[in-house]
């Protein structure tokens, strides 16, 4: 029974994690948005392969790698039943199916497309061996029509170099070629597909009103409201609402960091993290605050900074309802309620609630004092100690007794004094 459950959890297809655009939607995206889309889709492909899943459609991966236009590839049915009308695979150049798509290439963070040594130009034998899906080389012209007749359950392949020999009818290859990756027209409901082709979102969420162009997207979205998490990690039991999130989570257990920076050699678990890291070397800071003109390398940092101006605190503690502007601060705060101290000092065994406290404590053992007074040169291992010390030079006495008005340089001195009145 457990084996059946595990098997069901591993049934992740590219359809589950693909995000698609119509031609009109694609044209509305700017260069940065298109690049981000390609990076995320390629990362998803790589993670699926690294977990032993079948390689997604080769023509899509080829387009992603070579930066060609990526609007929806629709498969029509007939002139009478579908507004899509036998839509074709749009490319500017003839698309070459990559014959060998290796798992190792994905894990390096880039795809290596190796040419087949076979002289046979048809798309032929398919075999899944040692994690590699090996395909013979085949070409499709821009006018090639991959027309799937869903109501008959038949695949019709037309175009240069595509034969119908028995090698083409391997079950694995048929499933691979005919996978419902982007959109499949329904002969029984042509009106529904006409809406999808028109760029409308007929499937509405009753909870929040958000619209989707496919029922499956609506079903997946509804898990946000229901809290349903059908994808469970076999290693730790943690559950997720989407298969793509489970795949990314799995790298935590493997410890794998397949995306390496060519500049400094630093490795990352996700391609998106590598892309965020890259501006450190270029010095680029594209995100500028309109309030104070401060610029940021990453969008996430810019969003966090912007909350200092708006006062927004979207992260609320469920225990005491205290709100925070930063998710990390909420996580640190939550430990107050649990009493957990997960950060242990290797030198003395003392435990701390957050990593910053551990770092400060470790300076006692190392003798490091990074905070130096510009007036006298005295150094401290905590910034708060430097702030307290600087009052000596300024003569400031910010801590005043409410009872008698006497002022003190330090808060601790004020607390000692207040005992006189009690």
Swiss-Prot record:
Keywords: DNA-binding, Metal-binding, Nucleus, Repeat, Transcription, Transcription regulation, Zinc, Zinc-finger
InterPro entries attached to this UniProt entry: GLI_C2H2-zinc-finger, KRAB, KRAB_dom_sf, Znf_C2H2_sf, Znf_C2H2_type
UniProt source species: Homo sapiens
PROSITE patterns reported for this sequence: KRAB, ZINC_FINGER_C2H2_1, ZINC_FINGER_C2H2_2
Keyword Zinc-finger appears in the UniProt entry: yes
Zinc finger C2H2-type: from-to: 203-225, 231-253, 259-281, 287-309, 315-337, 343-365, 371-393, 399-421
Protein's name in the database: Zinc finger protein 550
Disulfide links within the chain: none
A GO MF label: RNA polymerase II transcription regulatory region sequence-specific DNA binding
Protein origin, superkingdom: Eukaryota
Gene Ontology terms: cellular component: nucleus
Described purpose of this protein according to its UniProt entry: May be involved in transcriptional regulation.
Sequence segments annotated as region (Disordered): 113-158
Encoding gene per record: ZNF550
